[in-house]
Amino acid sequence: MDNAGKEREAVQLMAEAEKRVKASHSFLRGLFGGNTRIEEACEMYTRAANMFKMAKNWSAAGNAFCQAAKLHMQLQSKHDSATSFVDAGNAYKKADPQEAINCLNAAIDIYTDMGRFTIAAKHHITIAEIYETELVDIEKAIAHYEQSADYYKGEESNSSANKCLLKVAAYAAQLEQYQKAIEIFEQIGANTMDNPLLKYSAKDYFFKAALCHFIVDELNAKLALEKYEEMFPAFTDSRECKLLKKLLEAHEEQNSEAYTEAVKEFDSISRLDQWLTTMLLRIKKSIQGDGEGDGDLK
């Protein structure tokens, strides 16, 4: 069956499902077997949704899954309703990001009501990713990553919570909310430095926190660096700590060339990602004579 044939069959199933729903509302049907009609309609909406999916008509698939979700709720089948809302969200993601968010929020409401916070957290991440990539609303992405982290923490899933919080910190710094970013990086650094499996990552978190301090104030960065070395002696021998000391020296001397050279040397061994490059450029622009710089670190 080609896509047009699948769509035709899906439309017929939708019409049949609507008839079942209307029939369930009549007085006698309501007394005798109204729920059976609604269950049949649920099944038809779901079949229609899957036919629309095969035909790649994502909006129609999302709508059909939504109809099924509402009927499942009418039947007090909370789990099935939430599952259908998630299916609707996944279909809408390909055609209507805002509607996808609405459906996922509906699923989250059901899951939190059922005490299923880990699943709710997962769907908050999906919403955050839609805001990141499709709708480009970073403030809203941050809010959903924070909510996800809260739910994960409540369920003692600290590793998953930290992943979300690191996203929050990275975006907060991009939006120049440096204090918020610093607090998160420091907290996660402190939590990981005593864990034999995770302590290697602690230096990265302290490095990022120090860069945020540096953008705000050079003295803050110096004091923070001393604090991190005291808290986590292994940080002193790290390439990140050595780079920070070189950058502080170059900044104090207002030496743009020395600053660039230190960054180049670090980058030749550990490639700088986009976030680090952005933060290092912001610091470089505060060196006198660099003006707005040439937008380059190399």
UniProtKB/Swiss-Prot annotation:
Q: Which Pfam families match?
A: SNAP
Disulfide linkage? none
Please classify the protein's predominant subcellular localization into one broad category. membrane
Location within or outside the cell: Membrane
Give an example GO biological process.
Answer: synaptic transmission, glutamatergic
Q: According to its record, how does it sit in the membrane?
A: Peripheral membrane protein
Matching PANTHER family = BETA-SOLUBLE NSF ATTACHMENT PROTEIN, SOLUBLE NSF ATTACHMENT PROTEIN SNAP
Quaternary arrangement and interactors, per the entry? Interacts with PRKCABP, and disrupts the interaction between GRIA2 and PRKCABP, leading to the internalization of GRIA2.
Name of the molecule in the record: Beta-soluble NSF attachment protein
